[in-house]
Amino acid sequence: MGVTIHYRGRLNNISLLPELEEELIDLAKSMGWNYVKFDDDWNEELHYTQEIKDGSLQMDGNLGLKGIVIIPPGSEPINFTVDPTGQLSSFFRQMSIIDKVTAEAMDWVFCKMQFAEISVHIWIVELLKYLKKKYFHDLEVHDEGEYWETGNVKTLQEKRETINTAMDKFSGAFESGEFAGQKNASAEEIVNNIESFFKKFIQKKKKKE
């Protein structure tokens, strides 16, 4: 199943949503990664329908989500979508609410890292740290790779089986964007470069403010 990152939290203030969306879009563009913006109607009743079309499951309706979903290479989409209260929420959670199925596990948003490079895992954790400081003060994170808790690359490597396997597969994750050309970088160099990226990004935002 691969290492998974679980996270949950609520926006400090719902009025911060437009700024959060702008920053996430800016970050995705800086990385050369795809993203999707969701802007459901919070005044409309929640509903959804599912059907098999052209061999795939398709869904339509109003799940009551606003925010950004970032799509890194090799990773599941990373949801930064919120409900009307500012609570981070996923499609699964909103669908469970509609279906009147409640479970504490549904309060956690998660992203499986099975096919993502180790650098993507580190990048996501650094992003979550940044968002916790600025937008989600009560953000909780459970990282099965333990990088959030320890900052220990070796531990993360062990959780992901072996770093050699991960780096051998590191072929296209950062061929475009901020980290192009780092195929042969060490794990420590990747961490330093990602941290440097976020420091520069924050400084850039402060200058604009």
Please provide the spans of the model-predicted regions.
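Acidic (Asp/Glu-rich) sequence patches and key acidic residues
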Residues: M1-E209
